[in-house]
Amino acid sequence: MGKKLDKKAKAGKSIKKLRKLEGKLWTREYLLKIAEFDGATIAPANGAAARADAMGTLAGEHHKLLTSEKSVELVRSLARETVAGGKIDDPQLLDEIRVLGRDQREASAIPTEEAEAWTRLTCEADAVWHKAKAANDWASFETYVDRIVAQLKHQAELMD
C-alpha cells in the first residue's frame, strides 16, 4: 500500500510541475499574441522592426522552455506513467500530456535560432502585408511570400 501511495504522490508532484510549465508557456504565447494583435491594429507602422525583434526573442524563450531537457523529460515521464498502469486517469490531463509531447517533438526538430527568425520574418511580413494590401501593391509583399514558403519547406524537411 505504501508504494502505491508513493507513486501517486510522485505523479502529483509531476502534475504540479506540468501545470507550472504550461503556465510559463501560456504566458509567452499570450504575450506573443498581444504583440501580434497590436502590430496588426494600432501599433505605429515604423515600429515593426523593433516589434519583430522583441517577438523573435520571446519566441526563442518559448522554444527553449518547450524543448528543454527538463521539460521534455517531465512530459515523457508523465506519458510513461499513463501507459504503465494508468496512474493518471483524468482524460483532459492525458490529452494535455499527449499534445504537449507532440508539440515538443515538432519544436525540437527546429533550432531555437530558426524559431526566432521565423517569428521575426512573419512579424515583418505582417506589417508589409497591411501596407501592400491597402495600396494594392503585391510586388512589395512578394519577396516575403517567397521567404515564408522557403522557410516552411525547410521546417518540413527538418521534421521528416
Predicted regions and their residues:
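A well-structured
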Residues: 2-159
